[in-house]
From Swiss-Prot:
Family statement: Belongs to the methylenetetrahydrofolate reductase family.
Residues binding NADH, per UniProt: 59, 183
GO cellular component terms given for this protein: cytosol
Its biological purpose: Catalyzes the NADH-dependent reduction of 5,10-methylenetetrahydrofolate to 5-methyltetrahydrofolate. Is required to provide the methyl group necessary for methionine synthetase to convert homocysteine to methionine; the methyl group is given by 5-methyltetrahydrofolate.
CDD domains in UniProt: MTHFR (cd00537)
UniProt organism field: Salmonella typhimurium (strain LT2 / SGSC1412 / ATCC 700720)
UniProt EC number: 1.5.1.54
Protein name (record): 5,10-methylenetetrahydrofolate reductase
Pathway named in the protein's UniProt entry: One-carbon metabolism; tetrahydrofolate interconversion; Amino-acid biosynthesis; L-methionine biosynthesis via de novo pathway
Active site: 28 (proton donor/acceptor)
Disulfide bonds: none
Length: 296
């Protein structure tokens, strides 16, 4: 029987336990619709803010009530935590003048970072008057915002082709976007191939991977089906038989996310955006294991 030399064993332990250098994280939240959801949201923000994320983002609904909730959450985060808070802003349901007014209001209230998106098309609607690239240009006309946009490693469901989707991302970057945050994915190779294609297309901004820690596999599969995200067969097998075992699902989901971050960090990725679904537990545990901790 052979045994590892002590130094070799320690090196193996380190490679299994660590990411490749320091990583940065950011978190996405959505506006709550009930008082109970609001309490959950603020509990999550309070806990995750201790990890000193680069920024946090808040999604933006297609109706005025949800837009107002986004503004309220953004204001609360800034006052309560001092974190950089980035509201999502969509252009599908607003005029250019309305968008300029919203942008000026954000700028005048100290908001410098916006996640610029087209937004979901209403059923039966025709060709939109504005796209995300147009919104980026409009925001840059109003003020020198720091702008994040969306990217799709596995292609946007409405795109005519992967190349057309890539050219759309390039238009957003050429209009002034500072970075792209990807749709969630589970196939690490799809992200790495996409990053290479971005470089080849002359897209020179950071492509931040969006990480979705999965605790409810059925829900994640629905999200994936709607957004053209592939669920690898190995992942389906890992969640098999866990429909009634929520705690084990969380452990499995956390391990998958941690492995993804470790692999990507070894490929030079330093920034990761977590889709929290307004829950702190899994994202906090994942970050802790990866070395992102309070006071560090």
């Amino acid at each position: 029987m052979s045994f590892f030399h002590a130094n070799q064993r320690e090196a193996l332990n380190q490679s299994l336990a660590e990411v490749q250098g320091q990583i940065n994280v950011s978190f996405e939240f959505f506006p709550p619709r009930t008082s109970e959801m609001e309490q959950t949201l603020w509990n999550s923000i309070d806990r995750l803010s201790s990890l000193k994320p680069k920024f946090v983002s808040v999604t933006y609904g297609a109706n005025s009530g949800e837009r107002d909730r986004t503004h309220s959450v953004i204001k609360g985060i800034k006052e309560r935590t001092g974190l950089e808070a980035a509201p999502h802003l969509t252009c599908i349901d607003a005029t250019r003048d309305e968008l300029r007014t919203i942008a000026r209001d954000y700028w005048n209230n100290g908001i410098r970072h916006i996640v610029a998106l087209r937004g979901d098309l209403p059923p039966g609607s025709g060709k939109p008057e504005m796209y995300a690239a147009d919104l980026v240009g409009l925001l840059k006309e109003v003020a020198d915002f720091d702008i994040s946009v969306a990217a799709y490693p596995e292609v946007h469901p409405e795109a005519k082709s992967a190349q057309a989707d890539l050219l759309n991302l390039k238009r957003k970057v050429d209009a002034g976007a500072n970075r792209a945050i990807t749709q969630f994915f589970f196939d690490v190779e799809s992200y790495l191939r996409f990053r290479d294609r971005c470089v080849s297309a002359g897209i020179d901004v950071e492509i931040i991977p969006g990480i979705l820690p999965v605790s409810n596999f059925k829900q994640a599969k629905k999200f994936a089906d709607m957004t053209n995200v592939r669920i690898p067969s190995w992942m389906s097998l890992m969640f098999e038989g866990l429909d009634n075992d929520a705690e084990t699902r969380k452990l499995v989901g956390a391990n998958i996310a941690m492995d993804m971050v470790k692999i990507l960090s070894r490929e030079g990725v330093k920034d990761f955006h977590f889709y929290t679904l307004n829950r702190a537990e899994m994202s906090y545990a994942i970050c802790h294991t990866l070395g992102v901790r309070p006071g560090l």
